[in-house]
Amino acid sequence: MKFLLLFLVVLPIMGVFGKKNGYAVDSSGKAPECLLSNYCNNECTKVHYADKGYCCLLSCYCFGLNDDKKVLEISDTRKSYCDTTIIN
């Protein structure tokens, strides 16, 4: 019974504090273009306050963005490709 109560309390909190992945956009609604992953990691972590980032399909893809950050709307196929690409 205690486990069920704990589950019911923790589950909504996890959704609130969850983070998202995607192409973070600036005030003009454009994602930064790139050729190098190092540039994207700096762009994502220092400008958009994400956990990390890399260059995926010529745009900076960020991991661990806050829920209030705007991201570029992309297809599910492209999102799953960038989510599963291995980062060194």
Curated annotation (Swiss-Prot):
Belongs to the long (4 C-C) scorpion toxin superfamily. Sodium channel inhibitor family. Beta subfamily. Expressed by the venom gland. GO terms for molecular function: sodium channel inhibitor activity; toxin activity. PROSITE patterns: LCN_CSAB (PS51863). It is found in: Secreted. GO terms for cellular component: extracellular region. Disulfide bonds join 34-55, 40-60, 44-62, 56-82. Excitatory insect beta-toxins induce a spastic paralysis. They bind voltage-independently at site-4 of sodium channels (Nav) and shift the voltage of activation toward more negative potentials thereby affecting sodium channel activation and promoting spontaneous and repetitive firing. This toxin is active only on insects. This is Beta-insect excitatory toxin 1. SUPFAM superfamilies: Scorpion toxin-like. InterPro entries: LCN-type_CS_alpha_beta_dom, Scorpion_toxin-like, Scorpion_toxin-like_sf, Scorpion_toxinL/defensin. SMART domains: Knot1.
